[in-house]
Amino acid sequence: AIAEIVTEALRLEETDEKHSNYRLITPVFTEIGSKDYGISAGYGEIHFTIRSWHQTDMEAATNDFMNEVQRIADEHRLRLESEIVAVFASNQNNEDVVKAITDSAKQLGLDMTERSEPFPWGEDFGLFTQRIPGAMFGLGSGKNTPALHNPDYDYPDELTPTGVNLFYQI
């Protein structure tokens, strides 16, 4: 059943970041049975991260996926327990705030790269931008720096003055 659930997650994904229905359903943890050979697993657990650009799409992706998970559990006569552990609300940048950030960066002579699509990772910051105007930006640490949240990422302290100056300018 767990293999079917993972397959269903892949089927429900829309991985094209430019697509209006962009959604990722990524397995992040799996545990099945125990190391007792010759018997079927009596327990399984699987965790997913679900991502999309907008909160309503996130809720729809979650509902679509959970309906399919329940269907698979029913087909295999399994008892399903589900829990939403962590929600990272989608971040919606406010155009006026984005302009203030870009104007400030230009005034400071900073190089800027504006992505055509947002980063696909979620942050708690989205909870703020759902209630008050805001925008999320990053300070680049170079192409040879490991990606943020990678185990080998080490924040380059020399970025701190740039960030402080930019926030002060904004």
Question: Where do the model's predicted regions map?
Answer:
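Midchain, well-structured core segments that form catalytic/ion-binding scaffolds
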Residues: 1-93, 119-122
